[in-house]
């Protein structure tokens, strides 16, 4: 198992992933300080009531499907798995960020302080 990144040292994508799992923000020196970094959205388990009535980031068609197939209760739960996000140079957040081959093979990953 690869260790996470420490302090200001640079490391591999594997080390960056370990750091992400521990809640750190990571970036690449090769991204030239454009304010871009990666973070992990942790897994979550939400009641179907909350999903149907309160979550704004899901389409109404999915909420309707949940209501029709699970009901609208505090007891029934939907598990949302963890995924990576990127804070992009234009200050948007990209959900479901995927590393390129270049990113995966790079040795210039660092923790954002």
Predicted segments, located by residue:
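Extended non-catalytic interaction/regulatory regions in multidomain proteins
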Residues: 1-89
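Short, compact, well-ordered microdomains
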Residues: 77-113
